[in-house]
A protein has these predicted regions:
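Short, contiguous alpha-helical
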Residues: 1-13, 17, 54-100, 139-180
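A short secondary-structure junction motif
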Residues: 44, 48-51, 89, 133-136, ...
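Acidic/histidine-rich alpha-helical segments that form the ligand environment
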Residues: 32-39, 44, 102-139
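Short, contiguous, helix-prone interaction/anchoring segments in small proteins
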Residues: 22-58
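Small-residue-biased structural context
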Residues: 2-6, 24, 33, 47, ...
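A generic "alpha-helical surface" signal
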Residues: 28, 32-35, 65, 69, ...
Length: 180
């Protein structure tokens, strides 16, 4: 049985729901969300102190620090997957264990500035490349080995726009609950 309170903390903007159609307008909006994520994230976290950064967004959840570093880790994987899909014929991508990565020392204790800077450059490149894609490029794909599922680039764009906003909401909702 699901716990609605826990689900609201885990998925503050809801679980990802793919659109019925990946229209040009949807893709443009998703790329805009990706392009603006680093600045929106920075505005929410830049003035937090160490204790706040080390506060989990929910019981047994990641800390704000871990969420920020996870976004860097995850979105680097997105960038590589995008490049593979554009340059190879339906490649099988490498799966990574995000929970294990989140427990590495850099994700646990490193200052957030390097990841904020990484996200700034990475998202510029993501948005730049994504904006250059034509309809045929958006249909190119890769295989994700976790569920042996083929994922098209247009789906990747929608998913990572959601992923950015999903983790940003973890932070903004925690700040609201704590009155920060």
């Amino acid at each position: 049985m699901e716990n609605p309170e826990l689900e609201k903390l885990q998925y503050p903007i809801g679980k990802y729901t793919a659109p019925d159609e990946y229209s040009a307008e949807f893709i443009k909006g998703a790329i805009y969300q990706i392009a603006t994520f680093p600045e929106r994230l920075k505005q929410e976290v830049i003035y937090l102190n160490e204790e706040q950064l080390d506060t989990p967004y929910r019981k047994e959840g990641w800390t704000i620090r871990q969420v920020i570093h996870h976004c860097g880790d995850s979105h680097m994987n997105c960038y590589i997957r995008l490049k593979w899909a554009l340059t190879e014929e339906i490649p099988i991508i490498k799966y990574y264990y995000e929970d294990r990565w989140s427990r590495l020392e850099d994700n646990l204790t490193m200052p957030i500035t390097p990841s904020l800077l990484l996200l700034e450059g990475l998202h510029y490149r993501l948005a730049y490349l994504m904006s250059s894609l034509n309809a045929n490029d958006l249909k190119k794909s890769f295989i994700h080995p976790e569920h042996n599922k083929e994922i098209q680039i247009k789906e990747l764009i929608g998913l990572y726009a959601w992923h950015s906003n999903h983790h940003l909401a973890h932070i903004t909702e925690l700040k609201k609950r704590k009155g920060w």
